[in-house]
Amino acid sequence: MQIFIKTLTGKTITAETEPAETVADLKQKIADKEGVPVDQQRLIFAGKQLEDSKTMADYNIQKESTLHMVLRLRGGY
């Protein structure tokens, strides 16, 4: 199923996923496609931050759902 991931810059990324796929799997796909390291990605759906070990079905993410990605930036100290 196709879903959309919207970034803070307003860019929309499309990704193929399945209900049984984990959030960690999806983050890896985004990393491969966009070059954003997995550990910097935070995905939000319906106001909730998604946990890596949960699946799309756990969050009721269905085809053409839109997730939001914010980046977790590391401190420079």
UniProtKB/Swiss-Prot annotation:
There is a cross-link at residue 76 (Glycyl lysine isopeptide (Gly-Lys) (interchain with K-? in acceptor proteins)). One of its GO terms (biological process) is symbiont-mediated perturbation of host ubiquitin-like protein modification. It is found in: Host nucleus; Host cytoplasm. Signal peptide: none annotated. Keywords: Host cytoplasm, Host nucleus, Host-virus interaction, Isopeptide bond, Late protein, Modulation of host ubiquitin pathway by viral ubl, Modulation of host ubiquitin pathway by virus, Ubl conjugation, Ubl conjugation pathway. Its main location: host cell. GO terms for cellular component: host cell cytoplasm; host cell nucleus. InterPro entries: Ubiquitin-like_dom, Ubiquitin-like_domsf, Ubiquitin_CS, Ubiquitin_dom, Ubiquitin_ubiquitin-like. It holds the Pfam family ubiquitin. SUPFAM superfamilies: Ubiquitin-like (SSF54236). There is a cross-link at residue 48 (Glycyl lysine isopeptide (Lys-Gly) (interchain with G-Cter in ubiquitin)). PANTHER family: UBIQUITIN. Viral ubiquitin that may play a role in the viral ubiquitination of nucleocapsid proteins to direct the egress of the nucleocapsid out of the nucleus, therefore mediating the formation of budded virus (BV). This is viral Ubiquitin. It comes from Autographa californica nuclear polyhedrosis virus (AcMNPV). The lineage of its organism: Viruses, Viruses incertae sedis, Naldaviricetes, Lefavirales, Baculoviridae. The gene is vUbi.
